Curated annotation (Swiss-Prot):
Role this protein plays: Involved in the synthesis of cell wall sulfolipids with activity towards mycobacterial trehalose glycolipids and eukaryotic glycolipids such as glucosylceramide and galactosylceramide (type I and II) but not towards eukaryotic 3'-sulfate galactosylceramide.
GO cellular component: cytoplasm
Protein name: Glycolipid sulfotransferase Rv1373
Record-listed 3'-phosphoadenylyl sulfate binding positions: 40-45, 116-124
Bridged cysteine pairs (disulfide): none
Family: Belongs to the sulfotransferase 1 family.
Highest rank taxon of the organism: Bacteria
EC number(s) stated in the UniProt entry for this protein: 2.8.2.-
Any Pfam family: Sulfotransfer_1
GO molecular function terms listed in the Swiss-Prot or TrEMBL record: sulfotransferase activity
GO BP: any one term: sulfation
InterPro entries, A to Z: P-loop_NTPase (IPR027417), Sulfotransferase_dom (IPR000863)
Length: 326
């Protein structure tokens, strides 16, 4: 659930999987990089791009999810995660699904924020849920989080199998903030459409800050080498176009899938039925098979209730739709 934290102006984001107050245990460093995105919006892809720049090549000192942990995730003791980060001598880059209004913005830190067409993110999460070992997730969560601090299951038992179309309708209509105790809302654990656009909105209103930069899944698909140059510039890391082209070959979906045991998140935690299936296809437009004409119309009505036109254009098409530098 989301609520105002009494000690700061941050919003508190707590669910079965994450607690943004875990950030209080970490001392940030000058030059740290925080990568934030809604689920299934290109965060792992961005971590891989940043890793290629930080290490100037494809090799990693360990699994990506250990080198660049999801700090908020409640399946590892925070002391263990912080100790790993404190021991790192390289420039740190840390994963979060927390919106920027749930983080303390530090002028010494770069915030790399990523978007994707919300419909594609929802389809991807639908498939990811089928690949996730929910029992294992719950065991890990309960081993870390005391009983009195645990959040209720992500959604109630509905008594019947739900079709993808039913899931999408709930996802489309759901509120920004789930009721207390629910943890997540549909779709299958992903935030609602309102949640996603809220998160992107927290970036959009801060996009002109010098240490906040926006990236988009569609732009990666269009020109991966060119997009690799953008975080290089933002992070002050020297890279030529030729070097970016060389590095980008290690960040294609096929390349990441071939090294899924290193690149996919949480591979050391046993939460996936298949590490390779985390990198399912990486395409766009699969949502069309689940949307009737009525859903199409409702979707466009709904998004215009939730966000301004410039944000919506960027959220759905990347810089082709609207350049956030404007």
């Amino acid at each position: 659930m989301n609520s105002e934290h009494p000690m700061t102006d941050r919003v508190v984001y707590r669910s079965l999987m994450a607690d943004n107050l875990r950030w209080d245990a970490l001392q940030l460093r000058d030059g740290d990089i925080i990568i934030s995105a809604p689920s299934k919006s290109g965060l792992t892809w961005t971590q891989r791009l940043v890793s290629l720049l930080v290490f100037d090549g494809p090799d990693l000192p360990g699994p990506l999810s250990t080198v660049s942990p999801w700090l908020d995730q409640t399946i590892r003791p925070i002391e263990e995660v912080v100790a790993t980060l404190d021991a790192q001598q390289h420039r740190r880059f840390i994963k979060t699904h927390t919106p920027l209004d749930g983080l303390v913005l530090d002028d010494r830190v770069s915030y790399i924020c990523v978007g994707r067409d919300p419909r594609d993110a929802a389809v991807s999460m639908l498939y990811q849920s089928a690949n996730m070992n929910e029992d294992r997730m719950r065991i890990l969560h309960e081993a870390v989080v005391p009983f009195h601090e645990r959040i209720a299951p992500p959604f109630a038992e509905l008594g019947h199998a739900r079709s993808p179309t039913e899931e999408f309708r709930d996802w489309m209509e759901g509120p920004n903030q789930p009721p207390p105790g629910i943890g997540f809302t549909h779709l299958k654990g992903i935030g609602t459409l309102a949640n996603i656009l809220h998160q992107l909105g927290t970036v959009w209103v801060r996009r002109h800050l010098p240490n906040v930069a926006l990236f988009h899944y569609a732009d990666y698909q269009a020109d991966l080498a060119g997009e690799l140059l953008r975080p290089a510039r933002v992070l002050g890391i020297a890279a030529t176009r030729d070097r970016a082209r060389d590095l980008a070959q290690y960040a294609t979906l096929d390349a990441m899938r071939s090294r899924a045991s290193e690149i996919a998140p949480n591979t050391t935690d046993g939460i996936w039925h298949s590490d390779e299936r985390f990198f399912r296809r990486g395409g766009s437009g699969d949502w069309q098979q689940f949307f009737t004409e009525a859903e199409h119309l409702r979707y466009y009505h709904r998004i215009n209730q939730l966000a301004p036109p410039d944000l919506l254009a960027w959220a759905h098409e990347g810089r082709r739709g609207y350049d956030p530098a404007n």
